[in-house]
């Protein structure tokens, strides 16, 4: 999917096409402005914006999500955590806008020193069956992808189609410029699952954002003690191809980055629901360790959906 934009709701009225065009223009302007300004000026502007949006409690859904992570009522989520979370989210977008013009070789050398668990990825590729890296929306996953391209070549991911098409294409062009192979979730020449299986059988790497799928295709899991749904794609790919399913986590360390690849999950049972639950458990441990860097501003749990939406999910 297009990282960070899943769940974007645009008005369904005659003006929606105008709104979508304006959204596209806004992202285009952001890309140009952030690249043109000095880093310190951009950082100060984004951090000021985060502090502004954190005033008066910050976004309600973000507060609800962090409350689950901390195990407290929403009102008890500390205001400094809300501010830090919004600053982290702003930093992600700031780096997205600047990443295409940064020195990727230099960045990769810097990241070589901080990425943990690379032996798990190396072992998966040495086995010749490919690797599925499954990540939550935390830290800067695009930065991790850039490193992966520099060290292991192109990997394959999937993007949800956005509207307008020009905005979707803008993000596709951005990620392809970093060396990613991006498959459309819908509307492609071949089903993405078929192509992903083919890549894995060729001992390639597949990367998927994997902690949220509030649709009928998602499988129900326990996440921080409450039911939600997560995508079955990572588990199904591992079962179908024999590829290693490697939970992966990204976070920020000061002005640097933290990345960790974890041991492969046991997929020998072929039980997609159980494997996805194991993935959810790993995600929960990592998000709890770095709550400010989990960029989830949309509903994550079934309890936060409307009754009509929950009824639709139950009617599958």
From Swiss-Prot:
Keywords for the protein's UniProt record, in alphabetical order: Acyltransferase, Cell inner membrane, Cell membrane, Lipid biosynthesis, Lipid metabolism, Membrane, Phospholipid biosynthesis, Phospholipid metabolism, Transferase
Catalytic activity: a 2,6-O-bis(alpha-D-mannopyranosyl)-1-phosphatidyl-1D-myo-inositol + an acyl-CoA = a 2-O-(alpha-D-mannosyl)-6-O-(6-O-acyl-alpha-D-mannosyl)-1-phosphatidyl-1D-myo-inositol + CoA; a 1,2-diacyl-sn-glycero-3-phospho-[alpha-D-mannopyranosyl-(1<->6)-D-myo-inositol] + an acyl-CoA = a 1,2-diacyl-sn-glycero-3-phospho-[alpha-D-6-acyl-mannopyranosyl-(1<->6)-D-myo-inositol] + CoA
Pfam families recorded: Lip_A_acyltrans
Gene Ontology CC annotations of this record: plasma membrane
GO BP field: glycolipid biosynthetic process; phosphatidylinositol metabolic process; phospholipid biosynthetic process
Broad class of the protein's primary localization: membrane
Enzyme Commission number: 2.3.1.265
Domain of life: Bacteria
Pathway of action: Phospholipid metabolism; phosphatidylinositol metabolism
Binding residues for hexadecanoyl-CoA: 137, 175, 240
Active site per the UniProt annotation: 137 (proton acceptor), 211
Compartments (UniProt record): Cell inner membrane
Record's bilayer topology term: Peripheral membrane protein
NCBIfam families named among the record's database cross-references: PRK07920.1
Biological role: Catalyzes the transfer of a palmitoyl moiety from palmitoyl-CoA to the 6-position of the mannose ring linked to the 2-position of myo-inositol in phosphatidyl-myo-inositol monomannoside (PIM1) or dimannoside (PIM2).
Similarity comment text for this entry: Belongs to the LpxL/LpxM/LpxP family.
Descriptive protein name: Phosphatidylinositol mannoside acyltransferase
Source organism of the structure: Mycobacterium tuberculosis (strain CDC 1551 / Oshkosh)
């Amino acid at each position: 999917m297009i990282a960070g934009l899943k769940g974007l709701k645009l008005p369904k009225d005659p003006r929606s096409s105008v709104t979508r065009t304006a959204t596209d223009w806004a992202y285009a302007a952001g890309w140009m402005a952030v690249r043109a300004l000095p880093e310190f000026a951009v950082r100060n502007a984004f951090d000021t914006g985060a502090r502004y949006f954190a005033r008066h409690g910050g976004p309600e859904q973000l507060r609800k999500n962090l409350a689950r992570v901390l195990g407290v009522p929403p009102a008890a989520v500390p205001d400094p955590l809300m501010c830090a979370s919004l600053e982290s989210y702003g930093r992600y977008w700031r780096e997205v806008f600047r990443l295409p013009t940064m020195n990727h070789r230099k960045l990769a050398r810097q990241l070589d020193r901080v990425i943990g668990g690379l032996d798990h990825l190396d072992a998966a590729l040495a086995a010749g069956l490919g690797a599925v890296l499954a990540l939550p929306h935390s830290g800067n996953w695009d930065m991790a992808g850039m490193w992966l391209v520099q060290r292991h070549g192109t990997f394959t991911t999937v993007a949800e189609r956005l509207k307008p098409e020009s905005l979707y294409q803008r993000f596709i062009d951005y990620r392809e410029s970093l060396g990613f192979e991006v498959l459309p979730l819908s509307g492609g020449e071949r089903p993405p699952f078929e192509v992903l299986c083919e890549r894995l059988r060729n001992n390639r790497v597949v990367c998927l954002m994997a902690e949220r799928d509030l649709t009928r295709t998602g499988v129900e899991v326990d996440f921080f003690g409450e039911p939600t749904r997560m995508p079955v794609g990572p588990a199904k790919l591992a079962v179908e191809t024999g590829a290693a399913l490697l939970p992966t986590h990204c976070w920020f360390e000061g002005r640097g980055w933290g990345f960790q690849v974890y041991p492969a999950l046991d997929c020998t049972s072929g039980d997609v629901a159980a494997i996805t639950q194991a993935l959810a458990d790993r995600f929960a441990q990592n998000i709890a360790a770095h709550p400010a860097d989990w960029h989830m501003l949309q509903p994550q749990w079934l309890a936060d959906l409307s009754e009509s939406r929950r009824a639709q999910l139950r009617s599958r």
